[in-house]
Amino acid sequence: MRLETQALVPYPVRFDRSHHDALVVLGATATGKTALAVALAQKYQGEIISADSRQVYRGLDVGTGKDLALYGSVPYHLIDVCDPYEEYNVFRFQQAVYGIVPSILRAHKVPIIVGGTGLYLDAVLRQYALVPVERNQALRASLRGASLSHMRAVYFSLKDSHAVHNKTDLEDPARLMRAIEIAVFHATHPELLQQARETRPMMRAKVYGIQYPRSMLRARIRARLEQRIRGGLIEEVAALHKGGVSWQRLEYFGLEYRFTAQYLQGIIATRDEYVDLLFRAISRFAKRQETWFRRMQRLGVKIHWLVHTENGFVLR
């Protein structure tokens, strides 16, 4: 299922440095984004910046599909930058990109941002105004023991429901608490948000997206999942837990880690059930990714779609 990195011919990609200073490659899971990004980096003297919220973590290799051998001699950034117990978020990602992109440009190379974490990509392409927010112990104490529905009501009293960046925060109490904390800070410190807006660097990025027909994408997801299981996904999750990463923390790292952790604990009874449940969950996740990218388009991000057809990839 791997795309050959030297085969740029099937992709109608064009990049002119006089009009753009960066490239972005996005798409749903299992669409071959990394392979295309590596080929572009080889062609245009680029350096890759990973926009994957899980590849930042050391030790999460098989389940996140790091496949570092694919990069060859191409320099890459934001892979293996923190330990599993650390918090990594969209603010840290945005700040890192704002530092990395200028350094790549100063070296007369092309920054190539690649990934499928829509929130991270959107934060850079639409330049979210983000500021660091400390933990608010008094607020946390006031909401200790509150129900999820009450916490959601508090959150929506502070933030327009249509402006919610990451709706998965609404399903997890810890993440929802953090979202409330940030919303309260933003409401009480508007001057810092304004300052963040005024100091955002400009980046002229040309954005390409890879898209497959639904049936073909599901086949690619299935093949890649089986490849990862053969490649040691279950053993990786077991080793992470043995090394001190809790089952609860492992579930935070996404579907591969969540379902594998449940299988190892006996919550999922059989291997066949585990594989089937995980495949279905990843397929649903791919649909949510595509929905996010369509939302980005509606909000002004121009995406040049490379759509797979029976005659190869066409630009739409």
From Swiss-Prot:
Which residues does the record give as ATP binding sites? 27-34
Catalysis performed (reactions):
adenosine(37) in tRNA + dimethylallyl diphosphate = N(6)-dimethylallyladenosine(37) in tRNA + diphosphate
Q: Where is this region: Interaction with substrate tRNA?
A: 52-55
| GO BP annotations, alphabetical order | tRNA modification
Q: Which UniProt keywords apply?
A: ATP-binding, Magnesium, Nucleotide-binding, Transferase, tRNA processing
User: Can you tell me which residues bind substrate?
Assistant: 29-34
Marked site (Interaction with substrate tRNA) residue numbers: 117
One GO MF term: tRNA dimethylallyltransferase activity
Q: Does the keyword Nucleotide-binding apply?
A: yes
- Listed InterPro entries: Dimethylallyltransferase (IPR039657), IPT (IPR018022), P-loop_NTPase (IPR027417)
Q: What is its EC number?
A: 2.5.1.75
Q: Give each disulfide bond as a residue pair.
A: none
What is the required cofactor set for this protein?
A: Mg(2+)
Record-linked NCBIfam families: miaA
Q: How does it assemble?
A: Monomer.
Q: What does this protein do?
A: Catalyzes the transfer of a dimethylallyl group onto the adenine at position 37 in tRNAs that read codons beginning with uridine, leading to the formation of N6-(dimethylallyl)adenosine (i(6)A).
Family that this chain belongs to? Belongs to the IPP transferase family.
Q: Fetch the HAMAP family from UniProt.
A: IPP_trans
Protein name from the UniProt record: tRNA dimethylallyltransferase
Give the source species. Treponema pallidum (strain Nichols)
The gene designation is: miaA
